């Protein structure tokens, strides 16, 4: 039996696992099996909070909404191409295909809106759990340049978008069904984005994986930026705690990082949060790694991106509004700093970290293909981090919220 997919529900009280032989649902505190079925090869599973409603992808293009309590099927939908991700909150159901996003009213299952996107094979998309701040975030679609080539009449229509070359995030109001902002998060294409439980913060990481940034939603002010490390790494999972005071990040390395969201670690101050972080920073710099292309000390890129013109388009209007707000904010804060320094601060390091136990899969992993994948979440009731790995292990680590430092493994299940 192979594990195909694993996810926490919106408040991290449940864990859902899709396998080649059905799916399982567990409570996280205490950890215990809540529901199991051994039928079907389930590619993706998503829960709606702690309800009995579950969304399943049974074949590449077929979605089934199931009531686990009644053991009944509510509805089934078939899509034109492979479903790559499913997102739920109490208002909306979001289906992510490689070049489209479908939005449904979750009460009636009526299709409300279809969004054309750039190719998005990694299904980079986030839906706020909040019903009030019901925002959807995804990479800004990039239009394909005009082509003089005329395909034959029998050829299928070509794509109107190309893969993104920068890390810009579009914020879409899923209730009003309109785009409301574009956040210029990174120079490199996005690898991971996540929204907090209130829909007021978004964390972003590029495919470099060295710098994590946090912006306010929907206005797009940059509030925090953190350094995960100096060596590029694939970011697999990011998760805010329910009070949005901590951000947990897992990657293709064996270290999981926790960053503290407080005034002291805002992007304008950016000092390392502990002596331990400074020691680890020094040891990493001694490796002689090259500067990170996504490092904010190279943030002169912001002015280059901002100077691009987007006249006559909705995205251009959104972008100019965002830039005007951001410029006035930066001008006020930057006035207190020497010229040339206000855009060149050192990002804060992690407040705490976790080392995953060595397993057969992690042995020899070097951060490339074949490394251990992980999904992270933080407990609502205790200062604990929950980690699920692709080799089928569930770990619980204790974190010292006053001192930070390395987390302690307290529980393990497989």
Curated annotation (Swiss-Prot):
Its main location: membrane. Residues 261-314 are annotated as: Disordered. One of its GO terms (biological process) is autophagy. Disulfide bonds: none annotated. InterPro entries: PROPPIN, WD40/YVTN_repeat-like_dom_sf, WD40_repeat_dom_sf, WD40_rpt. Keywords: Autophagy, Endosome, Membrane, Protein transport, Repeat, Transport, Vacuole, WD repeat. It is a peripheral membrane protein. Transmembrane segments: none annotated. Residues 292-302 have a biased composition (Acidic residues). WD repeats lie at residues 1-36, 69-114, 185-225, 230-269, 309-355, 367-407. It is found in: Preautophagosomal structure membrane; Vacuole membrane; Endosome membrane. Residues 262-289 have a biased composition (Polar residues). Belongs to the WD repeat PROPPIN family. Component of the PI(3,5)P2 regulatory complex. The PI(3,5)P2 regulatory complex regulates both the synthesis and turnover of phosphatidylinositol 3,5-bisphosphate (PtdIns(3,5)P2). Necessary for proper vacuole morphology. Plays an important role in osmotically-induced vacuole fragmentation. Required for cytoplasm to vacuole transport (Cvt) vesicle formation, pexophagy and starvation-induced autophagy. Involved in correct atg9 trafficking to the pre-autophagosomal structure. Might also be involved in premeiotic DNA replication. The N-terminus might form a beta-propeller domain involved in specific binding to phosphatidylinositol 3,5-bisphosphate (PIP2), leading to the association of the protein to the membrane. The L/FRRG motif is essential for the cytoplasm to vacuole transport (Cvt) pathway, for the recruitment of atg8 and atg16 to the PAS in nutrient-rich medium, and for its recruitment to and dissociation from the PAS under starvation conditions. This is Autophagy-related protein 18. The gene is atg18.
């Amino acid at each position: 039996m192979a594990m195909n997919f694993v996810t926490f529900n919106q408040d991290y009280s449940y864990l859902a696992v899709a396998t080649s032989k059905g799916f399982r649902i567990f409570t996280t505190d205490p950890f215990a099996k809540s529901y199991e079925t051994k039928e079907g090869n389930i590619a993706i599973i998503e829960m709606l909070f702690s309800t009995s409603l579950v969304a399943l992808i049974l074949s590449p293009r077929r979605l089934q909404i199931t009531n686990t309590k009644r053991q009944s099927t509510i509805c089934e939908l078939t899509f034109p191409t492979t479903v790559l991700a499913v997102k739920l909150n109490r208002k909306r159901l979001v289906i992510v295909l490689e070049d489209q996003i479908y939005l449904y009213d979750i009460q009636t299952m009526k299709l409300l809106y279809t969004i054309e996107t750039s190719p998005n094979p990694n299904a980079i998309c986030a839906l706020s759990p909040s019903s009030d701040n019901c925002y959807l975030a995804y990479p800004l679609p990039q239009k394909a340049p005009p082509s003089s080539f005329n395909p034959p009449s029998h050829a299928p229509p070509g794509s109107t978008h190309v893969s993104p070359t920068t890390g810009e995030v579009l914020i879409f109001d899923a209730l009003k069904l309109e785009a409301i902002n574009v956040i210029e998060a990174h120079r490199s294409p996005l690898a991971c984005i996540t929204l907090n439980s209130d829909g007021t913060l978004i964390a972003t990481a590029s495919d470099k994986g060295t710098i994590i940034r946090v912006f306010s939603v929907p206005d797009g002010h940059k509030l925090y930026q953190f350094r995960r490390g100096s060596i590029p790494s694939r970011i697999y999972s990011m998760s805010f705690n329910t009070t949005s005071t901590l951000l947990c990040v897992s990657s293709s390395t064996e270290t999981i990082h926790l960053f503290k969201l407080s005034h002291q670690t805002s992007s304008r101050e950016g000092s390392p949060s502990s002596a331990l972080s400074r020691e680890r920073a020094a040891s990493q710099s001694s490796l002689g790694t090259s500067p990170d292309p996504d490092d904010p000390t190279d943030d002169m890129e912001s002015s280059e991106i901002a100077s691009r013109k987007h006249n006559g388009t909705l995205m251009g209007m959104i972008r100019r509004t965002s830039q005007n707000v951001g410029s006035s904010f930066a001008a006020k804060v930057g006035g207190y700093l020497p010229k040339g320094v206000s855009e060149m601060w050192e990002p804060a390091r992690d407040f705490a970290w976790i080392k995953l136990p060595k397993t057969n899969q992690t042995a020899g992993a070097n951060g490339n293909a074949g490394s251990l994948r992980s999904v992270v979440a933080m407990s609502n009731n205790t200062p604990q981090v929950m980690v699920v790995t692709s080799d089928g292990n569930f770990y619980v680590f204790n974190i010292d919220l006053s001192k930070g430092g390395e987390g302690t493994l307290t529980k393990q299940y497989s």
